[in-house]
Amino acid sequence: MSISVTCCGTGTPIVVLHGWGMNSNIWQPVVPALSEHFQLYCVDLPGFGDSVWSSENDVSLESFIEQIMPALPPRFHLLGWSLGGLIATQIALTHSDRVMSLTTVASSPHFVESNDWAGIKPDILEQFQQQLDSNFKKTIERFLAIQAMGSEDAREQVKQVKQLIFTKPMPDQGVLKQSLTILQTADLRQQLPNIEVPFNRFYGRLDSLVPERAIDDISALAPESKAVVFTKSAHAPFISEPERFISELLKVVEN
């Protein structure tokens, strides 16, 4: 199997998907506590961490999912952060028979800002695309800095995340570029009403990538879903507020 999945703990299965440029080590701050309650499946997305990109297809939400699904248990709760939340949303739409609940973290059905939609400014993602050609490790580090921006311990958080993710292999450069294109172009807004499983959305109040003002717009598209805002967090609430994160996730699964 070309997909790396680290499994730990016992109990109800929960699959966790990381974000762009990262790998499954990003979840380490909450793994010990979560594995006391769940059987945790920490996935390296294809082309990231220890997972190789093995599809002959271009990088897309569908080709990510096609490679991930055979490595997952028959039924599971699904937790996706940032780009991982976008992939998780697509899984919930296309494999609802296997998904017990969907929780997205600092994620959006459409990441890019436009006149009537709050998101990442298009020129920021365009700069990342250009910088990837010259120095992709530095580009990931810059992305980390933007993710942490606004949180009280931003500098410490960036340092912690670097230590976590750089212990695994660097991402495949082609997958890195093409998955950034997914962030630039994917739009699942019109499909959100079709999500049939319990749907919870976690946000950081200080997040500059998925701004707080986007929350109500997403709620309007998915009125059955529930939004939880972490007041002291930017883009990574599970790092900034791990205890509350675990508590909120336990509520999701217990319900």
From Swiss-Prot:
Subcellular location: Cytoplasm
Role noted for this protein: The physiological role of BioH is to remove the methyl group introduced by BioC when the pimeloyl moiety is complete. It allows to synthesize pimeloyl-ACP via the fatty acid synthetic pathway through the hydrolysis of the ester bonds of pimeloyl-ACP esters.
GO molecular function: pimelyl-[acyl-carrier protein] methyl ester esterase activity
Pathway: Cofactor biosynthesis; biotin biosynthesis
Keyword Chloroplast appears in the UniProt entry: no
Protein name: Pimeloyl-[acyl-carrier protein] methyl ester esterase
GO biological process, one term: biotin biosynthetic process
Reaction(s) the record says it catalyses: 6-carboxyhexanoyl-[ACP] methyl ester + H2O = 6-carboxyhexanoyl-[ACP] + methanol + H(+)
Enzyme class (EC, first level): hydrolase
The AB hydrolase-1 domain, residue ranges: 13-242
Active site location: 82 (nucleophile), 207, 235
Enzyme Commission number: 3.1.1.85
Subunit: Monomer.
Keywords linked to the UniProt accession: Biotin biosynthesis, Cytoplasm, Hydrolase, Serine esterase
Stored Pfam families: Abhydrolase_1
Coiled-coil ranges (or none): none
Binding locations of substrate: 20, 82-83, 143-147, 235
Similarity annotation: Belongs to the AB hydrolase superfamily. Carboxylesterase BioH family.
InterPro entries to which the protein is assigned, alphabetical: AB_hydrolase_1, AB_hydrolase_fold, AB_hydrolase_sf, BioH
Species for this entry: Idiomarina loihiensis (strain ATCC BAA-735 / DSM 15497 / L2-TR)
A GO cellular component entry from the record: cytoplasm
